Amino acid sequence: MTNIRKSHPLFKIINHSFIDLPTPSNISSWWNFGSLLGICLILQILTGLFLAMHYTADTSTAFSSVTHICRDVNYGWFIRYLHANGASMFFICLFIHVGRGMYYGSYAFMETWNIGIILMFTVMATAFMGYVLPWGQMSFWGATVITNLLSAIPYIGPTLVEWIWGGFSVDKATLTRFFAFHFILPFIIAALATVHLLFLHETGSNNPSGLNSDADKIPFHPYYTLKDFLGMLLLILTLISLVLFFPDLLGDPDNYMPANPLNTPPHIKPEWYFLFAYAILRSIPNKLGGVLALILSILILALLPLLHTSKQRSLMFRPITQTLYWILVADLLTLTWIGGQPVEHPFTIIGQLASILYFSIILILMPISGYIENKIIKLN
């Protein structure tokens, strides 16, 4: 009699995905972040579900309902801050996951990579709409500024913005539809993540060397289930520490003021995880140009497989491109800092230079360095 996990139609899928899955024996801790993203998503869906039980998507009561959750609901404050800071942890894991993919050449798996980019856009849209729901000052003005960017689209722009708003400004209709989308999108993300995993298991995982690892594979369970469990413990420890000791560290104080359409905050800015893209948007004086740069700052990831010039997949043995990669990381941190600063000298010029450097490294310098490294290998 065969083992039930190998014969049962449902268990067989789970077995091939998480138990008997042949995995390279040398994948490092950078490969933990995929499973951590799964944990973050489950956590966000669960905490979000409990928050939705007490939240009201109406402009007159939304802010009060969030206050009610924090003050009157049993452990409501805990659930609310788990959800808010869980989003931050989600993005930290997401950025590391994408960064790992860039470093080790995982973008060679085209289907997996492209679904990953779609996932990233979907997660960003979900987070943006979630930020609008508490209906604080930054919620309202963030929604107004970001949705207004669509008016830069030629001909249909203004009509499109009013259609999204459901009126002539961000109001009750906007809040209601944002809540509806914010509720449904995580389930779409879960479905896309399953497809992402499906395509990954068609090819098998990449590994730090970027070489073929078919000759040296080990079963996923118990080796990587245990390793993922350690990552999960560290993630939960970090998140709980953040929630219990510094719950408002990553939030904006302006969001503790109820939304007021008659009073504009001095500095309108999104959550910290969008600041790099916001800085790129602001660095271009033209509205349409800024919007295009904003979209391209993420969409540029889709070009990575086409821009790969090196004969080696990973950056493990490529010191020149390695240096460029870490300059890119530093540049993204600079953009994140600039995105949170007011639009004045010297921040404007720093933002513009950092934006130029961001696109230059990916589009020009990395392909050239790959070509140079090929030449150096030939010389040896």
From Swiss-Prot:
Role summary: Component of the ubiquinol-cytochrome c reductase complex (complex III or cytochrome b-c1 complex) that is part of the mitochondrial respiratory chain. The b-c1 complex mediates electron transfer from ubiquinol to cytochrome c. Contributes to the generation of a proton gradient across the mitochondrial membrane that is then used for ATP synthesis.
GO cellular component: mitochondrial inner membrane; respiratory chain complex III
Membrane topology: Multi-pass membrane protein
Binding sites annotated in the UniProt record for a ubiquinone: H201
Keyword line: Electron transport, Heme, Iron, Membrane, Metal-binding, Mitochondrion, Mitochondrion inner membrane, Respiratory chain, Transmembrane, Transmembrane helix, Transport, Ubiquinone
Example of a GO MF term: ubiquinol-cytochrome-c reductase activity
Xref: InterPro entries: Cyt_b/b6_C, Cyt_b/b6_C_sf, Cyt_b/b6_N, Cytb/b6-like_sf, Cytochrome_b, Cytochrome_b_C_euk/bac, Cytochrome_b_N_euk/bac, Di-haem_cyt_TM
Protein name per its UniProtKB record: Cytochrome b
Name of the gene encoding the protein in the UniProt record: MT-CYB
Quaternary assembly: The cytochrome bc1 complex contains 11 subunits: 3 respiratory subunits (MT-CYB, CYC1 and UQCRFS1), 2 core proteins (UQCRC1 and UQCRC2) and 6 low-molecular weight proteins (UQCRH/QCR6, UQCRB/QCR7, UQCRQ/QCR8, UQCR10/QCR9, UQCR11/QCR10 and a cleavage product of UQCRFS1). This cytochrome bc1 complex then forms a dimer.
